Amino acid sequence: GYIKRVRNGVFSFNDLKGRQGIILCETAQKLKNYMDELGFYYYISGLDILAKYMLHIPEQYPVIAFIEKAAKEEIYNNLLAEGFEVIEPQYTKKMYEDAMLSGSHNMQVILYTTEDFQYSSEGLASIEKAFADLYFAITRNGYPLSLQELVRIYQNLSRLGNIDKKKLITVASRRNIQYDIRFIVENRFITDSAIEFGKILRREE
């Protein structure tokens, strides 16, 4: 079959299907099953696609998902009725912190809308799309993962040759974070002098 159980609450997609052993948390797996039933275009992105490149996978985290813009209201209502806690991206930090305090942070899904499904397949984002989306969520919306963890993910992806850096920059331009991502991708070619120059320039502006 497509899916095999790895451990309690974690599922993986068989390598034979070309998904490179992607690990989904239980919430993401439930979301995938339900969205497949509904029949709308969608894809899961972020940490679920990249979890295998982490040393320590968090026990719980909000799932990042993209859904077709035209069907937002219908999907939103269906997910709420199914018991998912649907989060608007701009409220990520607050909703997660509130849930942590109340102990009710199960089945949290951050929903982004899109009309572009180019960088996804079978309801799952490509590695490059997942990284750009996770970077955006952390740096722009306060997603609960440290930049240090994201650096480790990037280092592992690079070391294993599992990320296409040109494609990553292209994908990043769709989220308007291409300058950030280009800096990350080209970081080892940038001298300390140039970094210092940039810091001074920022202070002067």
Show the residue positions of the predicted features.
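Short gly/ser-rich loop at a beta-strand->alpha-helix junction or flexible surface loop bordering the NTP-binding
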Residues: 9, 24-106
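Short, charged/polar, Gly/Pro-enriched secondary-structure boundary elements
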Residues: 17-24
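Generic structural motif
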Residues: 16, 68-70, 114
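Short, flexible beta-strand-to-coil junctions
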Residues: 7, 69-70, 136-139
